């Protein structure tokens, strides 16, 4: 069974035709949801002022493509899976506001179309 990180790497690698054997580095920081997520998902909602644990993935090829995959947690709860693209837009495969899922396309991570 692949970890969430492995599933995300597999998905992004295939989506953007990246080298399969390239090592990814991970940067982990804590940041307030309001500073990370687009306003419409945070403003006046349950994520306001919540501290998120962010895991952002890097490699030479990802950097050249300006693609930054990420996984976000609040405490132990999964909040978001996705990537930031070359236009600095956040594309989500999964987004949860701590109370209910706003978007769930995790089936894409396990090879579904």
Model-predicted segments: where are they?
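Mixed-charge, Lys/Arg-enriched low-complexity segments
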Residues: 2-22, 86-113
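Acidic, low-complexity, intrinsically disordered interaction modules
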Residues: 32-102
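Negatively charged, low-complexity tracts enriched in Asp/Glu with abundant Ser/Thr
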Residues: 2-49
């Amino acid at each position: 069974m692949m970890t969430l990180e492995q599933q995300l790497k597999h998905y992004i690698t295939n989506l953007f035709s990246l080298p399969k054997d390239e090592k990814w580095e991970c940067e982990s920081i804590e940041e307030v949801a309001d500073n990370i997520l687009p306003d419409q998902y945070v403003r006046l909602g349950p994520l306001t002022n919540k501290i998120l644990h962010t895991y952002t993935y890097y490699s030479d090829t990802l950097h050249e493509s300006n693609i930054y995959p990420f996984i976000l947690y609040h405490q132990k709860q999964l909040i978001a899976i996705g990537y930031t693209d070359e236009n600095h837009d956040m594309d989500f495969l999964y987004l949860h506001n701590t109370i209910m899922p706003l978007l769930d396309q995790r089936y894409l991570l396990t090879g579904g179309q």
